[in-house]
């Protein structure tokens, strides 16, 4: 009887150690960065909110539009590389998991790279403001910890020279590196609503510009 109880006790300890190890390896996605897309006139309140917590501020020129009523973000190769370096360009790894995108695929001739759901990989061009942008499927990838369908749907990465020729609305993308995390996207304690509460507060700041501004909390692998 004693041996049986001892065996159960040892198994229980091993189970706790395994669960603890899995928990430790789980990516909680601490929100140590903010990715904002929109005109500077519309994002002043957001910038002010994080001014004291800001470690590094990166700014990029980007282009936006709509295709089939869905948002399109167009960035050049240099901007895409900056997102890769920050480890916020992610791609589908398995059905429900993702990993960072380490490199861009090779650019096909006379075409830009399209990042979208694999189901739409056969799209050959994206029409924006009456002009067609030839594209080739890159991978099922997005900017941010998880794909935010409300913020972005299609991402086009163009060579720097090609990007200049694409006619679309020009705006700004800001990547804020924060000194202190705003909370975890996958908190250790399920009742931890720190990041959720922050999202509610910041959404109120842009409620009048929801169609013009996109905002995501991101996890930056910060070497800056």
Predicted region positions:
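C-terminal motif of bacterial Sec signal peptides marking the signal peptidase cleavage site
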Residues: 18-21
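Positively charged n-region of N-terminal signal peptides that target proteins for export
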Residues: 1-6
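Sec-dependent N-terminal signal peptides
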Residues: 7-13
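Basic-flanked hydrophobic alpha-helices used for secretion and membrane insertion
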Residues: 25-224
């Amino acid at each position: 009887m004693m041996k049986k109880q001892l065996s159960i006790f040892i198994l229980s300890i091993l189970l706790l150690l395994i669960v603890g190890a899995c928990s430790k390896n789980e990516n909680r996605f601490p929100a140590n960065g903010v990715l904002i897309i929109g005109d500077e006139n519309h994002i002043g309140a957001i910038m002010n909110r994080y001014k004291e917590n800001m470690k590094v501020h990166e700014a990029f020129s980007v282009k936006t539009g709509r295709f089939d009523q869905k948002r399109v973000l167009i960035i050049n190769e240099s901007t895409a590389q900056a997102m890769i370096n920050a480890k916020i360009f992610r791609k589908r790894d398995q059905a429900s998991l993702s990993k960072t995108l380490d490199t861009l695929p090779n650019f096909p001739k006379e075409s830009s790279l399209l990042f979208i759901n694999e189901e739409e990989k056969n799209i050959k061009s994206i029409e924006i403001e009456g002009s067609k942008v030839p594209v080739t499927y890159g991978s099922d990838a997005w900017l941010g910890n998880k794909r935010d369908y409300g913020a972005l749907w299609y991402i086009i990465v163009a060579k720097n020279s090609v990007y200049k020729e694409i006619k679309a609305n020009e705006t700004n993308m800001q990547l804020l590196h924060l000194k202190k995390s705003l909370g975890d996207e996958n908190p250790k304690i399920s009742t931890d609503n720190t990041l959720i509460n922050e999202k509610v507060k910041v959404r109120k700041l842009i409620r009048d510009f929801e169609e013009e501004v996109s905002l995501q909390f991101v996890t930056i692998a910060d070497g800056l």
